[in-house]
Amino acid sequence: MGAATSALNRRQLDKFEHIRLRPTGKKKYQIKHLIWAGKEMERFGLHERLLESEEGCKKIIEVLYPLEPTGSEGLKSLFNLVCVLFCVHKDKEVKDTEEAVAIVRQCCHLVEKERNAERNTTETSSGQKKNDKGVTVPPGGSQNFPAQQQGNAWIHVPLSPRTLNAWVKAVEEKKFGAEIVPMFQALSEGCTPYDINQMLNVLGDHQGALQIVKEIINEEAAQWDIAHPPPAGPLPAGQLRDPRGSDIAGTTSTVQEQLEWIYTANPRVDVGAIYRRWIILGLQKCVKMYNPVSVLDIRQGPKEAFKDYVDRFYKAIRAEQASGEVKQWMTESLLIQNANPDCKVILKGLGMHPTLEEMLTACQGVGGPSYKAKVMAEMMQNMQSQNMMQQGGQRGRPRPPVKCYNCGKFGHMQRQCPEPRKMRCLKCGKPGHLAKDCRGQVNFFRVWTVDGGKTEKFSRRYSWSGTECASSTERHHPIRPSKEAPAAICRERETTEGAKEESTGNESGLDRGIFFELPLWRRPIKTVYIEGVPIKALLDTGADDTIIKENDLQLSGPWRPKIIGGIGGGLNVKEYNDREVKIEDKILRGTILLGATPINIIGRNLLAPAVPRLVMGQLSEKIPVTPVKLKEGARGPCVRQWPLSKEKIEALQEICSQLEQEGKISRVGGENAYNTPIFCIKKKDKSQWRMLVDFRELNKATQDFFEVQLGIPHPAGLRKMRQITVLDVGDAYYSIPLDPNFRKYTAFTIPTVNNQGPGIRYQFNCLPQGWKGSPTIFQNTAASILEEIKRNLPALTIVQYMDDLWVGSQENEHTHDKLVEQLRTKLQAWGLETPEKKMQKEPPYEWMGYKLWPHKWELSRIQLEEKDEWTVNDIQKLVGKLNWAAQLYPGLKTRICKLITGGKKNLLELVAWTPEAEAEYAENAEILKTEQEGTYYKPGIPIRAAVQKLEGGQWSYQFKQEGQVLKVGKYTKQKNTHTNELRTLAGLVQKICKEALVIWGILPVLELPIEREVWEQWWADYWQVSWIPEWDFVSTPPLLKLWYTLTKEPIPKEDVYYVGACNRNSKEGKAGYISQYGKQRVETLENTTNQQAKLTAIKMALEDSGPNVNIVTDSQYAMGILTAQPTQSDSPLVEQIIALMIQKQQIYLQWVPAHKGIGGNEEIDKLVSKGIRRVLFLEKIEEAQEKHERYHNNWKNLADTYGLPQIVAKEIVAMCPKCQIKGEPVHGQVDASPGTWQMDCTHLEKKVVIVAVHVASGFIEAEVIPRETGKETAKFLLKILSRWPITQLHTDNGPNFTSQEVAAICWWGKIEHTTGIPYNPQSQGSIESMNKQLKEIIGKIRDDCQYTEAAVLMACILHNFKRKGGIGGQTSAERLINIITTQLEIQHLQTKIQKILNFRVYYREGRDPVWKGPAQLIWKGEGAVVLKDGSDLKVVPRRKAKIIKDYEPKQRVGNEGDVEGTRGSDN
């Protein structure tokens, strides 16, 4: 064990572990605290073995004791721990940390007294401090001295590596925090400039901070040179020169010169101390840069402990660049002033200037449960004492009767009042208004002249542009924006054209307006001129007088002393009367006070004569601004304004004038080069106009946004609430400010009639209607505001979509209304108003197209139109209504578009209805006449989804809970020519589950109209590589069995029909069959295709065969259709084949390659065709790959069509991630490359079973593991890696799969590991399905084995080796081995082909004796070779070709040694 852990013996360790960390706490010291302390020793250049003895602990305390009052939390914790160890070594009995610290403080004071006594004794005896070795300590008295005197010479002692290491570690850990300055002071005590530069040089990674320090050094050095000019003339011999600024910085002086200036010069110049002061100034600037929080911003939180607040306060005050007096003033005033109300009451009771220890002791536990209990006990005690005083002879003042503030009756208080809460003013008690609008309140929310002139009522509206808002009592003009803007600042300003606006208030006879504008999101500081001297001062309306720092201003003339009251007490100032002050363009005369103020202040004595206005309102800066920019390389819109009628121009002028007053838009001039056209339309009531802006060009140039809300909330997903309220955020977009840097792009122009003058140009200050970024920015901003409100109002459930709010709660009506009012107040504080006229308090609530009640919900009334003539547009609207109604009305059909005749038409063209469409329309109208209602979601109760099949390939489903309908939906089959209803059913299941996850976040229990045996029979052979949940099987007639049965093996003793067909380019063809027993039939077809002829041949074989039949075909097209077992098809020929196959008992359908000399197939080919087609495969590989990427045909089709070897065709399919999968899935395909595996853990009989599946083949590896940990998972993965090649592993994101052990195995085995979301159909589809199949197999064989482990392994054997099906009709093991061997054959074939391509051929053609070439060898056969000369492929007899290797450099033709024909008879 290390030194820190062995600092105490067993007895001392027992005593140490019984000491509590805090007096009232339960936690005690542990050995981990010793280990931590040992690691912290190195920061202070101390060895950790000092913790092992009493003397060592005392040395540590001597180092830490001076730093403890201003140290960090870690330093204080270390000091406390060392104090406890000191007491343990000293055998002092202590119970907690405070007792140990008290004992150590006493000891430290004793040590300090002894040291002072020894120092005094030594000085009186010898006059100089000496150590035992005769080395004199420098005059500074510090123990960290870098110089020692030996005899009459001073010798420099460099800084120790431990000191430099401590300095570097402090900077690295604190990052120029406030602790760096005292740390530097402590480590550089008594250092020379050389040593200080050495400390700076070791900070190599902080060049930015060092540059700041360097600039401060240069400035101070220049000031030193100015204040200390060099003496004129040469220096006398032997005299030491005076140090210059660069000498103090150590750049032009030696170490010996620095020592002489410090210790022997006359007068002595302590260059080290001067240089330290310069460095400290630079470090303070760095601290301010790295800690931008001002001490003025440090305020105690409502639940923050006073001790934490004090720590933050002192950390910030150490970072302030101010003198000690100012910091002392800040500490005395701000520490109490910025405390929370609870602590402030206690601190004010301590009297003037309490010590920090008294404040910490008094505020200990404030805000906690014990403190609250104590306050409640004191209050109850006071109440009881008052009651006893009244009972004892009616002594004391009698209590007045209790009166309710809400209803005015006596006998109860407001919180006990049963009547509804009334809006009443807290100031005057009158109903009808709140305190913020009270006229009896002095100058509240009014435009206030400082000199006390008459004021006007203030209109609480937003104004970002600086214009004055209209009065709240003004007459509403009929032409104006439809909604009010929320509250904000309103103030006057000068327009961009330079014209001064009229003021609406009385200004004491001075027609000046407001002389300047300053936003209040920062301190209003302005440069003023006092007697011609520029002074930066704070404009403070709360200060009576103007007071300036003495260092900033020197005034001459008579003055008189004065004492003024401040936050920290009285201040002695000098009063100068009748002094000239210039603020902006106003020249005033008044009284100036000069004194020790922390900041210059302009008070009301000078502000009042200037007649300014103070406008108080809600600041729009509270709402965060979302930055927006244009796309890369795009520019803003520059579209000319089109002509408008006079009526529209006047309407736009009225609207924009109102918008400008409310601050939503502001005027711009011609310097803005962008423009967007505007126009206006009449509203629905035809009495008002609405302004519209054509932002199409700006939307094209604006950056892309992502809709943060991907859909509208559905009422079926809402929980049932006792109370509901629906709110609407009024003028939603106009409540959110637009990025100031983007506003210029929204500029628009209102033209004038007949171009009688220039148009008036504006730009938006808030989110405009019609701009692409407005919805996203509003959604994101409103969501962040509501997130904080939801935390403060947990009793409310708030659902937001854009500006519509659904608010529900389980409270009673009175409490609910109170909570909603709190919500509206909080939204109002952010500038989001909820107008009363759009607030819905009584059901039914209109919300998002629904009608809501507390116990149910309905769709708004849907009425189908009755028209004589219908256009395409009318039909589209009708289908949209039916789709919307289908979420609650079951049985609706939307096949009207397909049933209407006429083909594709324009939107306004008339369409003709078919009888089927009219019948469907009438049926839908009847369904909509009945009232349907949905219920709300009840958590904890399972949801069931019932599926019903409709006519025309449509499906309907209902979500129910306890028999009540939550929601209804419908599903239509995908657009496929040949479909299987079971496959459609699987797609429907996935749609239902996805919809349930979106709305409720859980999966429903499915009720499907199919028998279990029927489904499992189909699913066993045609399972999807996707996830299918559990469901209940409901037997209904439609899907009992609607498809035919295909057997896996030939039917014995039954005739075999070989079908074939041929088609010519003239659209004429033949189709027929020949049977094993000699039957044959051939028919001539007209106007057909080869595919149709193949299907016709199969139909003929089915017509002429018995109940059991074997059919062999060479058509991949026909084979692909029929093996999918479709139940319906758009092709009449396929429908006839399906009907014939359903009548059969057993059908064996097999494919063989065409034109390969296979018996039966060759005979039928001769009957229907002449000649065969041969294609060389090597030139067709790229074409085959392109065709496969487009149509995804299988490898057999590729090999047959393009004449490719099987291994080449299989490789093309294997390279496609969409095709190398099991079955024929429609959705949810996963990557099934040859090396891809999926792994998951499942549970069986309370044991963990880990399963891995090879995706491409379905091969399973599984075993029982003791625990679901990363170690066991890694061991299982290593077993599989030792047996099979793995290149990619896909799992879910469980902790065992994301562990370090699994990551290490994947790294070692070069396995790409990906994770996905559990139950996602596109993630773990294969493994989820295999888990289900494995459990089904185990259930069938569980009785045959004793142990679960044996059952799992036996199930793997049965699945891998005993079941055939899927791709190629093989077992999983055969398929996996086939995939691996195919990979090896491909590699071998590629090597062989590459070798062949390395040969060159010289050849002769016909009777031409000239040898041609060289050509590229493509293929070498027994009697001929295939070569490529240029772009031509040629077949040349073997005897007319000479093959040579392509050596470099090329060989000559006459070199017979390289000619293949000269090497022997084998060639």
UniProtKB/Swiss-Prot annotation:
- Give the record's PTM text: Specific enzymatic cleavages by the viral protease yield mature proteins. The protease is released by autocatalytic cleavage. The polyprotein is cleaved during and after budding, this process is termed maturation. Proteolytic cleavage of p66 RT removes the RNase H domain to yield the p51 RT subunit. Capsid protein p24 is phosphorylated.
**What's the record's note on cofactor binding?**
Binds 2 magnesium ions for reverse transcriptase polymerase activity.
UniProt keywords (A-Z) are:
Aspartyl protease, Capsid protein, DNA integration, DNA recombination, DNA-binding, DNA-directed DNA polymerase, Endonuclease, Eukaryotic host gene expression shutoff by virus, Eukaryotic host translation shutoff by virus, Host cell membrane, Host cytoplasm, Host gene expression shutoff by virus, Host membrane, Host nucleus, Host-virus interaction, Hydrolase, Lipoprotein, Magnesium, Membrane, Metal-binding, Multifunctional enzyme, Myristate, Nuclease, Nucleotidyltransferase, Phosphoprotein, Protease, Repeat, RNA-binding, RNA-directed DNA polymerase, Transferase, Viral genome integration, Viral nucleoprotein, Viral penetration into host nucleus, Viral release from host cell, Virion, Virion maturation, Virus entry into host cell, Zinc, Zinc-finger
Query: What residues does Mg(2+) 2 bind to?
Result: 1114, 1165
Could you tell me which residue ranges the Integrase catalytic domain spans? Answer: 1230-1380
UniProt: Zn(2+) binding residues = 1188, 1192, 1216, 1219
GO biological process terms held by the UniProt record: DNA integration; DNA recombination; establishment of integrated proviral latency; proteolysis; symbiont entry into host cell; symbiont-mediated suppression of host gene expression; viral genome integration into host DNA; viral penetration into host nucleus
Spans annotated as RT 'primer grip': 845-853
Where is the motif named Tryptophan repeat motif mapped on this chain? 1015-1031
**Pfam families referenced in this protein's UniProt entry, alphabetically:** Gag_p17 (PF00540), Gag_p24 (PF00607), Gag_p24_C (PF19317), IN_DBD_C (PF00552), Integrase_Zn (PF02022), RNase_H (PF00075), rve (PF00665), RVP (PF00077)
Q: Where is this site: Cis/trans isomerization of proline peptide bond?
A: 233-234
Q: Where is this site: Cleavage?
A: 145-146, 376-377, 443-444, 515-516, 616-617, 1057-1058, 1176-1177
> Looking at the keywords, is Membrane present?
yes
Q: Which residues form the Reverse transcriptase domain?
A: 662-852
Q: Where is this motif: Nuclear localization signal?
A: 26-32
- Extent of motif Nuclear export signal: 16-22
Q: Which GO terms describe its molecular function?
A: aspartic-type endopeptidase activity; DNA binding; DNA-directed DNA polymerase activity; exoribonuclease H activity; RNA stem-loop binding; RNA-directed DNA polymerase activity; RNA-DNA hybrid ribonuclease activity; structural molecule activity
Q: Where is the active site?
A: 540
Lipid modification (N-myristoyl glycine) maps to 2
Q: One GO term of the cellular component aspect?
A: membrane
Question: Which additional comment does the entry carry?
Answer: This is an African green monkey isolate.
- Record's function text: Gag-Pol polyprotein and Gag polyprotein may regulate their own translation, by the binding genomic RNA in the 5'-UTR. At low concentration, Gag-Pol and Gag would promote translation, whereas at high concentration, the polyproteins encapsidate genomic RNA and then shut off translation.
Descriptive protein name: Gag-Pol polyprotein
| Gene that encodes the chain | gag-pol
